[in-house]
Design a protein with these regions (language model features):
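Ser/Thr-rich, Pro/Gly/Ala-heavy low-complexity intrinsically disordered linkers and tails
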Residues: 17-62, 66, 71-72, 79
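Short, surface-exposed beta-strand/strand-loop-strand elements in extracellular ectodomains
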Residues: 241-253
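Extracellular Ig-like/FN3 beta-sandwich strand-entry sites
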Residues: 275-277
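Short, solvent-exposed beta-strand-to-loop segments that form ligand-recognition rims
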Residues: 250-267
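Short beta-strand-plus-loop segments that form exposed binding edges in beta-rich domains
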Residues: 281-291
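Aromatic-lined ligand-binding clefts that engage carbohydrates, nucleic acids, or primary amines
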Residues: 231-244, 280
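Sec-dependent bacterial lipoprotein signal peptides
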Residues: 1-18
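Extended carbohydrate-recognition surfaces in non-catalytic/accessory domains of CAZymes
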Residues: 61-230
């Protein structure tokens, strides 16, 4: 397996900086900032001595970047006022060139895996119970992946499949998320969250809440890190399963097949050391028609753009 980490430094205001997305355009704001950080906790990153030398030029995307799809909502437009951010499917994992010289800003690179919704035991239908806190262990397992607990054996039969690329089971895609600047936060908010609608899929689409054909049955995997300054908040609202780990410990636990559910973590409550860099790992699963909601809102100052593991079977 090959790990690619896309490094970026922070902006002066201490807000979230994410991603390694599209090239700067007329909507961007170029910024030049110091880089370097250190940490030695169990989930922190030892990135060396702090440097006062200028870091890479970053482009804060204040408008939807070229080639991105704006976050989608209800067909009747009733939730148009809350939609924020957007996404861009870069391409299939394992078929992309190594990134180089990419400017980092509020674009976050993730892995999404497309499953055949009704051919996997964990996808395609309601599970009992619908809310399943404690579905995964409270600490990250090997490879920075969640480990299934012994609870709710019928809710997730093959959870190890969700965040692994497996021939005949799923197809992995590299996707960039644009988090839109909103006040002092950055937000991605979609009530019709279907980034993989246009990828080639062997299965027929299912109808969403508006009767529109959609590609259900997918997971999202994010690995990044942030510099803790004090006062930061990370909020996720969505369906179905969502697990967020900070410093290797579970801080948002929304397991099960259910409607939109929200979890918030105040970083000050985690007993971290200010000035150090800590890992953040997010895992999401959309398992059941007809709804798909996804909202991230944060004031975190991310220290890198995300890391991608090429685990495509050779």
């Amino acid at each position: 397996m090959k790990l690619t980490q896309l490094a970026c430094s922070s902006i002066a205001s201490g807000l979230l900086l994410l991603g390694c997305g599209s090239d700067p355009d007329e909507s961007g704001v170029n910024r030049n900032h110091p880089s370097g950080s250190a940490g030695n906790g169990p989930g922190s990153l030892d990135l060396g001595e702090v440097s006062t030398a200028p870091g890479p030029i970053e482009t804060l995307q204040t408008a939807l970047p070229t080639g991105f799809v704006a976050a989608t909502g209800a067909k009747n437009g009733g939730d148009a006022g809350q939609l924020r951010g957007g996404w861009h499917v870069v391409g299939p994992l394992g078929k992309l060139p190594e990134p180089s010289g990419m400017a980092c800003a509020n674009v976050l690179r993730v892995l999404m895996r497309d499953f055949a919704t009704f051919k996997h035991p964990d996808f395609g239908g309601p599970k009992d119970p619908q809310n399943a806190p404690g579905l995964v262990e409270p600490t990250l397992g090997a490879g920075r992946k969640p480990t299934r607990s012994g609870k709710y054996p019928k809710v997730a039969v093959k959870l190890d499949d969700w965040y692994a690329t497996l021939k005949g089971v799923n197809t992995a895609y590299v996707v960039d998320f644009w988090l839109e600047p909103v006040g002092q936060s950055f937000v991605l908010d979609s009530s019709r969250f279907f980034p993989l609608d246009d990828v080639e899929s062997a299965e027929a689409k299912q109808s969403d809440d508006d009767g529109q054909p959609r590609n259900f049955g997918f997971t999202t995997e994010l690995h990044t890190s942030f510099r803790y300054a004090g006062g930061e908040v990370f909020t996720f609202r969505g369906d179905d399963d969502v697990f967020v780990y900070v410093d290797g410990k579970l801080v948002v636990d929304i397991g099960g097949v259910h409607g939109p559910t929200e979890g918030t973590v105040r970083i000050d409550d985690l007993s971290l050391t200010q000035g150090r860099v800590y890992t953040l790992d997010l895992f999401q699963a959309e398992r059941n028609p007809t709804g798909s909601n996804f909202r991230i809102e944060t004031t975190l100052d991310f220290a890198d753009c995300g890391s991608i593991v090429d685990d495509v079977p050779k």
